[in-house]
Amino acid sequence: MRKMMQRFAEARIIIPAPQNGRDEIAQADAEAAIREAFGGFTRIEGFGSWMADDGTIYREPVYVYDIAAPLLMGAGEDAGREWAGAMTALRRIAAQIARDMAQECVYLRSPAGRVHFVKPDGTDYYQDVEPHPFPRVSG
């Protein structure tokens, strides 16, 4: 039987910086959930901006959480279960943050590099939405 090797891939969750006591509690709860599921994280303070569908531009300080998500390297069901477990935990944490901080969605980058915008119910924001076309850049 071939021995499984433990490897890690980076996941990322981005949340708005807390604005009030309720947000600070939600942030502390999220950090506890990340530590419990993955053993720890690195938090970086940053700045984010996004444009709503109506054209309104939002700018806000954010916290970026980099998380080492364990991935079993090897064949078989154990590797698949490990991957599914990491994604389930990440999605659950992102949805919890969205609920607790009253966010429409929370940015989650999976260990495979795919970006999700997770809604409070745990589904992807863009799951049933037609993607926006990229604007043409002249040059």
List the predicted regions and their residue ranges.
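Positively charged, small/polar-rich N-terminal and surface patches that mediate targeting and assembly
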Residues: M1-G139
